[in-house]
């Protein structure tokens, strides 16, 4: 089976600004991928390249074994939900579904109708009158009912309250189970990603800082607390980030084997260590 996404030295430049630089990742099919990074890290650029909305400056990218947006058949295999869950405010819920059926050859109207009923959306309600959570549900339903092989979601829950976010993520997991579809989910909300993702890509400064299956990454990362002595780390260990207080140092360490005094680190702590290490610190500021 082809990987969902494969990139090699993928680079995107806007005039003098490098939005994405030398990005090399392989995402196995069927994964729920969390894409994390600060504003300006290159997340939306990478998603735009995956969906074929923009073209790379250099390097290569394959999505589901083919060039992104290589034709109508390839486009139908990828469902996309952009930031703020864009919908047509003057169209009703039912009109969105009819439009989806007209534009997508593999449209699953039964799936779309069931999901709309489950979330209590009025088919005659115009999208502009829906709540933020309802608009997100409608956008996700339209993307999933394409019956593609990959869903690409660009910060779809950023503006939602906790209950609406939970409902959205529940539906997303239902779609994954029912359709055997892969997902790339960009988000700043690490707690949400920790609940649903089994693969992680961390971007900062347009570069990949970390990528891999979550279970494997967590097994290789450890928190070591105590007196600041990196020399006591085993051979092959890599210090990712250290934070020092008046009395001790807390270090996030990557090592394939056991680390003396090491304790498990969660996805949030691991991710923040890489993001902090990749962020320039103003002169004189504490690290």
Q: Locations of the language-model features?
A:
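The feature captures the beta-strand-to-loop junction immediately N-terminal to the Walker
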Residues: 36-38
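Helix-to-loop junction immediately C-terminal to a conserved catalytic motif
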Residues: 51
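Conserved ABC transporter NBD signature motif
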Residues: 59-74
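ABC-family P-loop ATPase nucleotide-binding domains
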Residues: 83-138
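Catalytic Walker B motif of ABC-type/P-loop ATPase nucleotide-binding domains
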Residues: 151-155, 160
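ABC transporter nucleotide-binding domain
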Residues: 166-253
């Amino acid at each position: 089976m082809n990987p969902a996404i494969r990139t090699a030295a993928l680079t995107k430049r806007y005039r003098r600004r490098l939005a994405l630089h030398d990005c090399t990742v392989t995402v196995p099919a069927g994964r729920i991928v969390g894409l994390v990074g600060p504003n300006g890290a290159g997340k939306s650029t990478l998603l735009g390249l995956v969906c074929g909305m923009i073209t790379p400056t250099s390097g290569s990218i394959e999505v589901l074994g083919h060039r992104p947006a290589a034709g109508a058949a390839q486009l139908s295999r990828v469902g996309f939900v952009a930031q703020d869950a864009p919908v047509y405010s003057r169209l009703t819920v039912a009109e969105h579904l009819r439009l989806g059926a007209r534009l997508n050859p593999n449209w699953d109207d039964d799936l779309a109708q069931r999901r709309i009923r489950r979330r209590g959306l009025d088919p005659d309600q115009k999208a502009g009158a829906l709540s933020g959570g309802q608009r997100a549900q409608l956008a996700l339903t339209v993307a999933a009912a394409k019956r593609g092989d990959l869903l690409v979601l660009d910060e779809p829950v950023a503006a939602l309250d906790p209950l609406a976010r939970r409902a959205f993520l529940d539906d997303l997991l239902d779609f994954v189970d029912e359709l055997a579809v892969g997902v790339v989910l960009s988000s700043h909300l690490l707690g949400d990603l920790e609940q649903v993702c089994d693969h992680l890509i961390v971007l900062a400064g347009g570069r990949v800082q970390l990528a891999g299956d979550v279970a494997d990454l967590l097994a290789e990362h450890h928190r070591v607390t105590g007196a600041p002595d990196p020399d006591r780390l085993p051979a092959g260990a890599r210090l990712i980030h250290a934070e020092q207080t008046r009395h001790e140092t807390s270090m996030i360490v990557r090592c394939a084997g056991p680390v003396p005094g090491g304790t498990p680190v969660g996805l949030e702590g691991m991710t923040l260590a890489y993001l902090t290490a990749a962020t320039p610190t103003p002169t004189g500021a504490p690290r």
